Amino acid sequence: MSIESDMIHVEVVYALPHEQRVFNLVVNNHATVEEIIRQSGVLELYPEIDLAKNKVGVFSRNVKLDATVRDKDRIEIYRPLLADPKEIRRKRAEQAKAAGNADPVTGGKPNALRK
């Protein structure tokens, strides 16, 4: 086997609210997700990334740090959620009920046929 056939092209992506960083790398085809992220330099540029806490994925599918990748894969580092989506929906429904924009029983849209 040649050295070139042992190498693959991958991207490491980290997105912030107003910035997206893409790191293009050529790595060994047996490298793990964690090794590739460390090689990319993203951890030095963004010290807030903690691989023990931040989830990672390949093309929007969660993967473990010890997973291997294929040629042309995109490794994504996800930021933690700021708020629980269920809690946000519950608060929004309560506000709609209080404002009279929701059915007081179901919490959904008011039914004009119901009295």
Curated annotation (Swiss-Prot):
SUPFAM superfamilies linked: MoaD/ThiS
Chain intervals for the UniProt region annotation (Disordered): 92-115
InterPro entries per record: Mopterin_synth/thiamin_S_b, RnfH, RnfH_sf
Family in the record: Belongs to the UPF0125 (RnfH) family.
Designated name of the protein: UPF0125 protein VP0646
Organism name: Vibrio parahaemolyticus serotype O3:K6 (strain RIMD 2210633)
Taxonomy of the source species: Bacteria, Pseudomonadati, Pseudomonadota, Gammaproteobacteria, Vibrionales
